[in-house]
Structures are given as C-alpha cells and as structure tokens.
Swiss-Prot record:
CDD domains according to UniProt: PTKc_Src, SH2_Src_Src, SH3_Src
GO CC annotation terms, alphabetical: actin filament; axon; caveola; cell-cell junction; cytoplasm; cytoskeleton; cytosol; dendritic filopodium
Annotated source species: Rattus norvegicus
UniProt name for this protein: Proto-oncogene tyrosine-protein kinase Src
Binding residues annotated for ATP, in chain numbering: 276-284, 298
Record-annotated SH2 domain positions: 151-248
Chemical reaction(s) catalysed: L-tyrosyl-[protein] + ATP = O-phospho-L-tyrosyl-[protein] + ADP + H(+)
C-alpha cells in the first residue's frame, strides 16, 4: 500500500524471525509448473531428483474450518463440528479474560475443547493451568494442523497478502502461505522483495500438491509437508526472489462478540471515556466494556428511532461479518440506545482525509482504500442487504490504512422529520441516488451511486461533493443529467468509473463485485504508467 503503513507495535502481533542460514542467491520470478512428479524424500523431507515418491507415514493434517480476516490478519474459525474428532487445540494469540466465565490463555498454550456447539465461544480446559472457561474460537487452531503455523494465513486474497507484505518496515523475504484463489487444494507462497526498478514488491509462487501427497514449487524440489517446504526455503533461495526470512507480522483478530452471551448488555457495564465525534442523531465515544475491553460506543438521542425496530434490525446487523465491515459487538436497547462496536483508532475516513495524514496520501493508497470499501460492500451485496448511507463519514480507518464500512442499515430506522422527508436539512442528499432521494427506492444500486460520490471524496481529500451547490440545486441538476467533472489530477479512467456508478438507470450501474475487482487491479490493468503528482 505504500510507505504510510506502520508495523503493529503491541504485544499481540505474531512475528517470528526464521533461523538465519547461508545466503543462496537464486533467480527471481515464479517457477514453471511441470507434470505431477513422483520422487522420494530424504530424511529432512527434501526429495532428491531420482527416486520414487514414498508417502509420509502420517497423512497431512486436514484443514479445519474457514478463515475470516480482521484488521490485518485472518484466523481460523469454526465451520462446523470438530473435524475428525479433534479436541486439542493450540492458542494462536494471547487472550485476557473479560468476564468471570471466560478463560485467559497465552499464545502456544494447549487447550482441550469441552464443548464447541455454542457458536463463536467454546468451553475449553487449559492443559497448562488446569482452568476451564469460554474462549473465542477464532483465537485457536487444531494442534499440529496447518492453521496452527504462524505463516499460514488461509483464505486471504492475493491483494490482501500484498497489503500486509508491502509494509516498508518488513525486511526482504517476509512471507506468508495462503490458499490459492484459482486452484482448489493448492497454496501460494507470497514473499516481499525489493529492487531498484520496482521498489518494494511482492512475488507469488504457486505451491502445487502431488497426487500421492507432498508439495512442490518447482518439480526438482519436493517435500512431504508445507512445514518442510517453508523450512527449506528459509535456508535456500533456490530460485525464489529471496530466501524466507520473517513471517509476515499480524495483529490479533476481533473476537466475534464481546464474550459468551454478551449481546444486550447493561448500560452500567460501559464507561464512556473520550468523545470522538457528534452528529445530528447522537455522539460517538471511545470507551471500555466491563472494565476490560476497548470499544467504540455510539449513543443515539432519544426519539431517533424505535427501540423495538432497532433491536430487530440489530439482530440482522450482528450476523453481517466481514473483515471490511465494522463489527457490531453489543447493544443497550433501552433509550438512550447505545451501539457498541469495535474501535478503529484513526477515526472516520472523512476526518482522516482532511487531517495531517491526508495531504501525504497519493493515488495508490486512495485506490487501495476504495478497493477495501468496495470489498466490504460486495459482501453486503452478496448478503442482499442495503447500506443506505454510504459516504466517507461512515467509513472508519485503523492502522495501516485499513478501512471498514460502518453504520450499515441504521439510516432506514431514523424517525426524525428533517431526515425522513429525504430533502430535509439532515438528509445526505449529495450522496443519494436520485431514485432514492425522490421516491425512497433504496437498493444496493443506490449504494453504488453513493460509492461513486465517495470516490470523489477520496480523490479530493474530503471536499464536500458538488461544491457551491445547495441540496435542492443538486437534485434538480442531477435529474437534468449533470454529473460532477473529473477532480484535479484524477485519472480519466477513475472518473469514468464514477460516471458508471452515476448512470441514471440503477440496473446499468456496476456491481460492487466488479468495482472491487477493477480497483484491486487498477495499477496493473488500467493505469500501469501512473506517476505520482503534487496531490495524487
């Protein structure tokens, strides 16, 4: 993403330097794939070039569950009953208990799972301390499985792996292993590299699986397991751009909810500490839940919405889980309503763009941020949900320019007359598609229109859309066919994308899936000759 990223400093990050070894220089670039080979392994798992493959004594551990990423990491999550009767798990991170019923543990601790049928929090017994309590299921992985390896990142995308590895503080050879996006059952080794022509970049090597077991990048060098492959390339570049040096740094994922059965919580369990912002309908605070857990708290003015309608909608909202959506943790459902979410320490995207950091952001960072937002909205699209109020003020920013969509679905519940009139003073008319503003037809396609407006906010570093025009004028002009011109220094190709989002007929606007793909590949497919300008 560029030099604006900074390495996570807290003790929660999982990072390990691999054993230094001799420097073996090899050619850069990916290896050609050949036919499925059959060659034997030596005692260390590395197979020589001239003998028949002997399957390992123990079968490769089965993959367990899926993956779901948070700010900067994906972590194993339960996808069903424990695979193959596995009940012993290993902790991937430290966890400090938040209630009397959950269990503290340290990274590397082995845990016996007592009951995993209760959703995101499992009852577990620590084999180290002898204590029993609830644990977040996405903080552990089956013992001796691939997920338990620090370098295994599971189902993250190629783009997300680059986002993590392109941290200026990562040394050459920083790496991770992920599932292949294109070949079922295969993996990909992603490695950070540096050269004078490209600067910091990432190379991706497909790890192929043998029919009879084992793995290889190039057919001349084969291994019984991924662990042996990683150990070998940590000592020898052997054709990679660089030998593997350091596991890609990661931060703890968000837990799914605050604790076991902590959904409707008492107001007294929250402490409001630092006021972060104020809007038409309430305030946003940084605070603490139960004296243990940092959270963000949105307080709504009484009368903003019906508590019953809010609680019903919140039940739907809490099921929306994606690494690019701000996670809803808990609610206080009696007025004044409190909405408790994960805390994002850089605040709203709008304030971030207008602040000190905004002036240093260039097009690659801004396009990457827009791709993250499109990724979150593509999930909303797949879930047949509608945001209704997509704009920079409702996007939150965390470390390393991570962006997450917030406040999805709340706009539908607001009962204020100045808002429900749709052309009242509190209604975000400049972001709203004409069919939604005029006739109340809010759909995912009206969200696409709003995303086009959000792109102008990004490329102008937070300027209000339609400068010099009042709401009524905007509505009239847009109905007559007016569309905002290309912002200064913004490539025409990006303005063309905005105009696609602003097509009059909703069904002619692109999908968020398309927008995500376009933006993620923007500098390879659309603007490969990009050169930084004064502002972009």
């Amino acid at each position: 993403m560029g030099s604006n990223k900074s390495k996570p400093k807290d003790a929660s990050q999982r990072r390990r330097s691999l054993e230094p070894a001799e420097n073996v220089h090899g050619a850069g670039g990916a290896f050609p794939a050949s036919q499925t080979p059959s060659k034997p392994a030596s005692a260390d798992g590395h197979r020589g070039p001239n003998a028949a493959f002997v399957p390992p004594a123990a079968a490769e551990p089965k993959l367990f569950g899926g993956f779901n990423s948070s700010d900067t990491v994906t972590s194993p999550q339960r996808a069903g009953p424990l695979a193959g009767g596995v009940t012993t798990f290993v902790a991937l991170y430290d966890y400090e208990s938040r209630t009397e019923t959950d269990l503290s543990f340290k990274k590397g601790e082995r845990l016996q799972i007592v009951n995993n049928t209760e959703g995101d929090w499992w009852l577990a017994h620590s084999l180290s301390t002898g204590q029993t309590g609830y644990i977040p299921s996405n903080y552990v992985a089956p013992s001796d499985s691939i997920q338990a390896e620090e370098w295994y990142f599971g189902k993250i995308t190629r783009r997300e792996s680059e986002r993590l590895l392109l941290n200026a503080e990562n040394p050459r050879g920083t790496f991770l292993v992920r599932e292949s996006e294109t070949t079922k059952g295969a993996y990909c080794l992603s490695v950070s590299d540096f050269d004078n022509a490209k600067g910091l970049n990432v190379k991706h090597y497909k790890i192929r699986k043998l029919d009879s077991g084992g793995f290889y990048i190039t057919s001349r060098t084969q291994f019984n397991s991924l662990q042996q492959l990683v150990a070998y390339y940590s000592k020898h570049a052997d054709g990679l751009c660089h030998r593997l040096t350091t596991v890609c740094p990661t931060s703890k994922p968000q837990t799914q909810g605050l604790a076991k059965d902590a959904w409707e919580i008492p107001r007294e369990s929250l402490r409001l500490e630092v006021k972060l912002g104020q809007g038409c309908f309430g305030e946003v605070w940084m605070g603490t839940w139960n004296g243990t857990t940092r959270v963000a708290i949105k307080t709504l003015k009484p009368g903003t919405m019906s508590p019953e309608a809010f609680l019903q909608e919140a039940q739907v909202m809490k099921k929306l889980r994606h690494e690019k959506l701000v996670q809803l943790y808990a609610v206080v459902s009696e007025e004044p309503i409190y909405i408790v979410t994960e805390y994002m320490n850089k605040g709203s995207l709008l304030d971030f763009l207008k602040g000190e950091t905004g002036k240093y952001l260039r097009l690659p960072q801004l396009v990457d941020m827009s791709a993250q937002i499109a990724s979150g909205m593509a999930y909303v699209e797949r879930m047949n949900y509608v945001h209704r109020d997509l704009r920079a003020a409702n996007i939150l920013v965390g470390e390393n320019l991570v962006c997450k969509v917030a406040d999805f679905g709340l706009a539908r519940l607001i009962e204020d007359n100045e808002y429900t009139a749709r052309q009242g003073a509190k209604f975000p008319i400049k972001w709203t598609a004409p069919e939604a503003a005029l006739y109340g037809r809010f759909t995912i396609k009206s969200d696409v229109w709003s995303f086009g407006i959000l792109l102008t906010e990004l490329t102008t570093k937070g300027r209000v859309p339609y400068p010099g025009m009042v709401n009524r004028e905007v509505l009239d002009q847009v109905e007559r066919g007016y569309r905002m011109p290309c912002p200064p220094e913004c490539p025409e190709s990006l303005h063309d994308l905005m105009c696609q989002c602003w097509r009059k007929e909703p069904e002619e606007r692109p999908t968020f899936e398309y927008l995500q793909a376009f933006l993620e590949d923007y500098f390879t497919s659309t603007e490969p000759q990009y050169q930084p300008g004064e502002n972009l």
